[in-house]
Amino acid sequence: SVEAAKKIGAKSVTIHSNALGDGGVVVNHYDDLSDTVKLCSMYDMLLECAKMAEKEGVNMNLEALNITTDHVGNFLKYTQVGAEICRLINSSRLNVLYDVYHMQLNEGCICDTITNYVDRIGHVHVADAPGRHEPGTGEINYKKVIRHLEACGYQGFVGYELFPMTDTAAAVKAIIA
């Protein structure tokens, strides 16, 4: 992914603990491996990838995914685990992609989590929960979340990764509102 990003001029890539197939389905759950083995393998792989990312000048954003609705069987499901791995590897090119939708489903406490890990958040994804629709259609107070990101000093990108409740134009209007 890092080499492909460099080739096309992309500045960052999103990475996951498990390969995802069509519709975001986890390809292999690795049920035969313990969580300790999975964690150590992920650390070793990310350490090598971080070296490559540093050499190529590409940022990698490690995304935890919800395991209740969209990505059953995904290993990385909590911000804390991803952020602590990033802290241990200590590369400016490896950070967490904090997906508010996924983390609302897995762990809640969005503002507390942002406060605790803002130093390792490299990108933010936005969609409301439940449903993964535009802000204002679910239970997340996005005005509060965005204000909190700003108050914590987050200066990175915020991307909208969602399924419009009606159509794209209406979703864009809701996002701007």
For the regions a language model picked out, list residue spans one by one.
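Substrate-binding cleft and catalytic face of glycoside hydrolase catalytic domains
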Residues: T14-V25, N61, I67, N74
